[in-house]
């Protein structure tokens, strides 16, 4: 389901194809408020990678403020809930994650933090914010995610 929504949003941004799914329509209305600003450039479905790290991923939306040169990462999520704490206090199972609550909020924060780390280190792109845009039937709920840079570096170091 999420893949269809992503595709509809991408097609709307790239060529103006009207979305059909209710969550895609709500997302298009929300993102449209930003796209219409003359100083904002929007890039959907941006692939980032690092040969050195052997890692690649796809950023749902990368926005650039042409005045400041800063970027914002946006990741669409169709989850009903984004829990900020884990069930029964469960933590990560590796030594690098054993202090991090095992919950969707942290999973998403780590995902966006990895993308941000790759953009900043390997592409020289300055990221100002990273957001999860949670798609509801009637609105988009935004979650400003922390940059977990130290955790990402620790995890990446454990693989090398």
Label the model's feature ranges.
Residues 1-58, 64:
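Metal-dependent nuclease catalytic cores that hydrolyze phosphodiester bonds in DNA/RNA
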Residues 6, 59-65, 69-85, 89-95, ...:
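Conserved catalytic cores of phosphodiester-cleaving nucleases, focusing on short active-site segments
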Residues 15-16, 98-103:
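Surface-exposed cleft-lining segments at the edges of enzyme active sites
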Residues 43, 72-75, 129-132:
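A structural signal for short, well-ordered beta-strand segments and their strand-loop junctions
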Residues 49, 78-81, 137-138:
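Short, solvent-exposed loop/turn segments at secondary-structure junctions
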Residues 51-52, 94-98:
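Gram-negative outer-membrane beta-barrel domains
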Residues 54-56, 69-71, 140-142:
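Short, mixed charged/polar active-site loops
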Residues 101-160:
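Metal-dependent nuclease catalytic regions and adjoining charged, substrate-binding loops involved
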């Amino acid at each position: 389901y999420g893949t269809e929504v992503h595709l509809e949003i991408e097609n709307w941004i790239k060529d103006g194809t009207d979305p059909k799914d209710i969550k895609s329509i709500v997302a298009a209305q929300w993102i449209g408020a930003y796209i219409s600003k003359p100083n904002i450039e929007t890039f959907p479905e941006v692939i980032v990678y690092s040969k050195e790290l052997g890692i690649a991923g796809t950023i749902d939306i990368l926005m650039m403020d042409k005045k400041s040169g800063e970027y914002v990462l946006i990741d669409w999520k169709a989850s009903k809930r984004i829990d900020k704490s884990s069930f029964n206090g469960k933590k990560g199972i590796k030594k690098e994650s054993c202090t991090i609550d095992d919950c969707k909020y942290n999973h998403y924060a780590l995902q966006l933090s990895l993308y941000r780390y790759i953009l900043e280190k390997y592409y020289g792109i300055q990221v100002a914010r990273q957001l999860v845009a949670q798609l509801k039937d009637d609105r988009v709920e935004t979650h400003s995610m922390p940059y977990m840079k130290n955790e990402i570096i620790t995890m990446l170091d454990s693989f090398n």
